[in-house]
Amino acid sequence: MSTEIGTVHRQRALELLEADSHKIRRLIEVQLANLTMPQCPLYEEVLDTQMFGLSRQIDFAVRLELIDASEGKQLLDSLEQQLSDLHDAETC
């Protein structure tokens, strides 16, 4: 794979993972606003399932060398912090 094509694939992989991260955040925002309380087992199940799925996608992209492990970790850490902030705002 040429360097130019590799760069395009890496950028696209990161964009897709960031889009998935945004979708998870929106899902949790909607769930918190309309459906459940943060202490609800359903909320925890959805959150755990979505975060696990994203972590597997990131791991796959890292193994394919489409993104660096540090980029994947930063993406997960950022989403976890955003979701923690949402949770804190709902429980206050």
Curated annotation (Swiss-Prot):
Protein name listed in UniProt: UPF0358 protein Exig_1994
Signal sequence range: none
HAMAP family xrefs: UPF0358
Family annotation (InterPro entries): UPF0358, UPF0358_sf
Coiled coil: none
Family indicated by similarity: Belongs to the UPF0358 family.
